[in-house]
UniProtKB/Swiss-Prot annotation:
Record protein name field: Zinc finger C2HC domain-containing protein 1C
Alphabetized GO MF terms: zinc ion binding
Family note: Belongs to the ZC2HC1 family.
Source superkingdom: Eukaryota
Organism: Homo sapiens (Human)
Cofactor(s) this protein requires: Zn(2+)
InterPro entries: Znf_C2HC_C3H, ZNF_C2HC_dom_1C
Binding locations of Zn(2+): C391, C394, H406, C410
Segments passing through the bilayer: none
């Protein structure tokens, strides 16, 4: 058995052991017959060994063909077409006599796909295992099939599972045919890919343009909304300012009317006094009434000139001018209120009774800035000097109608003693040092003045 196994391992692929005893030489024929008759179990073992060897070769070739033909339907078809000879091997196993006869006639069965052809008629046929120039038959090239054509072919054959497309023979895949087909497939695929890429680029460009347009439209709408909102706010503010200006203008007009009425009340009695020639009274130049009249007339002239020059000016400039004028009027009114109590005694002094004309001369002489009127009694035209009085507090000399006011102010200034701030007492407040300073007294608390430096 070990010898048979070694022999089978060294045999070539397409060669099988002969079983025809007639081809053996004559002297060994008797021995062979006795051997066949005596040991049938050895023949059965030999047949089993041969069958196992053929099966192993078949399985190896199936694996190689599975790698070459990837399409499942082609794979099954090639298996069906190329490996139909196991039936023959089974027949040979079942009928060893016919096998021996076939071998006797010169027919041999090989393990390849051409095993069922007779050897004599197979001279023109090139075996599959023989190599040709430029093509490796052990590893042929895989067919290039486009996936679309594959999908259509599969879709067309799904209905009928028994009908398979005839796969191309291995010899059909030559280098020239493969190159032509490959170029055609690449050209078709390139055109399709270029078209799809162009469509995608156009779609992406249109989409980006649409997105940019939408963004610009949204930004424009937001800007318009913001402008509308600001316009509404500005209109509201403008209405408020106009109402405020109207209110200020009405207030100013009312204040002006009130001031005019007060002025008429003040001026009418003075004009009546002036109209009375018998009771002539000389009004001092610097009296508060004269100043007020002068300021009022000046303001009126300014208002007239301003109104003529600013007729076409804006409302804001006009309102500013009105506000300044109102402030000025209030300031004048406050000054008048302050001067009223001072002017009353001076008026009384300037208006003595009419029975004594000498008193009128005396009162008129008290004003240093006013010229003296001639005496009504026809006395001499000599001008009397104004009478001066001395202040009891400071010793200065003043006119009699000013002396009283100065004396009041001077007495207040002299009588008020300013309290000097003592930082040492402020620091000692609330401590035992304060008690000590109070016990010691203010005389001792006074610090001696620093000595004058005479280093020069």
């Amino acid at each position: 058995m070990a010898g048979l196994q070694r022999l089978a391992s060294h045999l070539p692929v397409g060669v099988m052991l002969p079983h025809n005893t007639t081809e053996a030489p004559g002297p060994h024929s008797a021995k062979q017959d006795s051997y066949e008759q005596g040991d049938s179990s050895q023949q059965s073992l030999k047949g089993h060994l041969r069958n196992n060897f053929q099966k192993q070769l078949l399985s190896n070739k199936e694996l190689i063909l599975d790698k070459v033909y990837t399409h499942p339907k082609w794979n099954t078809q090639t298996k069906a077409r190329s490996y139909s000879y196991p039936h023959c091997t089974g027949i040979s196993q079942q009928d060893p006599e016919s096998d021996s006869q076939g071998q006797g006639n010169g027919l041999f069965y090989s393990s390849g796909p051409q095993s069922w052809y007779p050897k004599a008629n197979n001279q023109d046929f090139i075996p599959f295992t023989k190599k040709r120039v430029g093509v490796d038959r052990a590893f042929p090239l895989k067919p290039m099939v486009h996936r679309k054509s594959c999908s259509t072919g599969e879709a067309g054959t799904d209905g009928d599972h028994n009908v398979y497309p005839r796969p191309p023979e291995p010899r059909e895949f030559s280098s020239r045919n493969f190159g032509v087909r490959n170029q055609g497939n690449f050209s078709v695929v390139g055109t399709v890919l270029a078209a799809t890429q162009a469509e995608k680029a156009v779609a992406n460009f249109d989409r980006t343009e649409w997105v940019q347009i939408r963004r610009l439209e949204a930004a424009g709408e937001s800007l318009e909304e913001e402008i509308r909102r600001k316009q509404i706010l500005l209109r509201g503010k403008l209405k408020k300012t106009e109402e405020e200006l109207r209110r200020i203008q009405t207030q100013k007009e009312q204040a002006k009317e009130n001031e005019n009425g007060e002025l008429q009340k003040i001026i009418l009695p003075r004009s009546r006094v002036k109209g009375n020639k018998s009771n002539t009274m000389y009004k001092p130049i610097f009296s508060p009434e004269f100043e007020f009249e002068e300021e009022f007339s000046r303001d009126r002239r300014e208002d007239e000139t301003w109104g003529r020059s600013q007729q076409n000016s804006g409302p804001f400039q006009f309102s500013d001018y009105r506000i300044q004028r109102l402030k000025r009027e209030r300031l004048v009114a406050s000054n008048n209120k302050i001067r009223d109590p001072v002017s009353e005694p001076s008026v009384e002094k300037f208006s003595p009774p009419s029975e004594t004309p000498v008193g009128a001369l005396q009162g008129s002489a008290r004003n240093s800035s006013l010229s003296m009127a001639p005496d009504s009694s026809g006395s001499s035209g000599s001008i009397e000097e104004p009478q001066l009085g001395e202040c009891s507090h400071c010793g200065r000399k003043f006119l009699s109608f000013r002396l009283e006011r100065h004396s009041n102010i001077c007495s207040r200034m002299r009588g008020s003693k300013r309290k000097v701030f003592d930082s040492s007492r402020a620091r000692a407040k609330g401590t035992e040092l304060e008690q000590y300073l109070n016990w010691k007294g203010p005389a001792s608390a006074k610090a001696e003045p620093p000595q004058k430096s005479n280093w020069r």
